[in-house]
Amino acid sequence: MSTDSILNPQSAVDIIRSRTVFVAGAGVAGKGIVAMLEGIGGNFKVVDDRAQVADLNTAEAIAAVSSAETAPALLITSPGWRPDSELLLAAQAAGVPVIGDIEAAWLADQAGAFGTPRTWIAITGTNGKTTATAMTTAMLQAGGLAAVSVGNIGTPPGAALVADERADYLVAEVSSFQLHWAPSFTPDTGVVLNLAEDHLDWHGSMAGYAGDKLRALRGPRPVVAVDEQLVRELAADNGVPNVVACSMQDPAEVLAQAHFPLVVGVVESEAGAVITEVATAENGELQVTPIASAEAISPPGPAGIADAVAACALVRAFDVPPVAISQALHGFEVQAHRGQAVHLAEGVIWIDNSKATNPHAAIAALGGLENIVWVAGGQLKGAEVHDLIATVGPGLRGAVVLGCDRAEIIRELAAQFPDLPVTEVSNTDPEGAMAEAVAAARTLAAPGDSVVLAPAAASLDMYTGMAQRGDLFAAYARGTGAEAGTSEWEGES
């Protein structure tokens, strides 16, 4: 059954103001939805199985939507609710429109419920979303624009609309879950950074996953990472118009290969790599605009530069000057667990990329680094690791593998790189396992090496989330033990 429930902005606001709305989920996203509904003056009921934070539990809500007398006029779901959950299926069967938090906030904003509509920027992809979102927000702010990060990081989108200090630019990190429930969401500009098999149990197929991601490109200025074959083909096959290209290649060479109105890429020179914009003028000549040095970007390596290039391509739509972009980029500090350098001692750098929860993310995390001691393992969720090992193996000094699916990684390492030193950590205590892993990595590492936590797997086999896993890695790397390993759960989207 289709999940699309198309509403126009004004009709959505009219429903909220005059009829009953159900909000599925009372977590962070749900609270943001509630804040927005209260700002509009809506009548709503929160659905959650935690009685202390809800008006209805799931069973009660299913009964309500199944009756014409008690069914809501609209159901707004938090992104964690699966399309095949009984409540959402019951709502759709009853003809109740189902939308997500991004869709609801965008509709309310476009209707003018909170003043002049804002500018929306959507950033999605299998990996790199958070860093690219934070970079984009920092660049806009450096250019003097009132911008805030919303969605998976920063402020829930609904809460951003009712904030005391208005933001004119909403930079939304949007997961495939959120886009799934956003049938009419049309950002002013958006980017798909990359695509790899992920969350297929949620979306049902790679086609479903990719189709949901494509919704970020429906605006008038879509940005496409043309180095990524799946992204490039997705945009081409679906006829996405007016594509702005971002690439790690020389932008003039990209422009020569295909027609784009504008390309942002990387130009190598004797002074180092420079992020550069190239466009074709009306007279056919190339207009070349150097934007910022690509040297010393955080996080280090190609993945960090790729995120910076995408962010530059997005903000140039709003005439942010290169000097402001450069200032923001070189003052930027990566968020925790996303390639953050957490310790440096005896010539060895320790890097926490606990957010690399799938093989594609691990490849990005390790790319560009040499002499790596790799700390890996956790829940693979059925992901294949053959290509991952083939890609990263040549750069490894050694590996330390822990977690419930460690045997598969160890087996593949032995098959492809039989001489590589590999330490297995069988301890299943969260703190004990990480303490052993860090101790083993310290033994393997030599001056000039990088010890990188890039698990290629989810963390919930042992940890409360990827944040706790990364915190413990950093704490033991610094020699402070488990005292920092107390972060609350953080989801892995």
From Swiss-Prot:
ATP binds at G125, T126, N127, G128, K129, T130, T131. The keyword Protein transport does not apply. Pathway: Cell wall biogenesis; peptidoglycan biosynthesis. It catalyses: UDP-N-acetyl-alpha-D-muramoyl-L-alanine + D-glutamate + ATP = UDP-N-acetyl-alpha-D-muramoyl-L-alanyl-D-glutamate + ADP + phosphate + H(+). InterPro entries: Mur-like_cat_sf, Mur_ligase_C, Mur_ligase_C_dom_sf, Mur_ligase_cen, MurD. One of its GO terms (cellular component) is cytoplasm. The keyword Disulfide bond does not apply. SUPFAM superfamilies: MurCD N-terminal domain (SSF51984), MurD-like peptide ligases, catalytic domain (SSF53623), MurD-like peptide ligases, peptide-binding domain (SSF53244). One of its GO terms (molecular function) is ATP binding. This is UDP-N-acetylmuramoylalanine--D-glutamate ligase. It comes from Corynebacterium urealyticum (strain ATCC 43042 / DSM 7109).
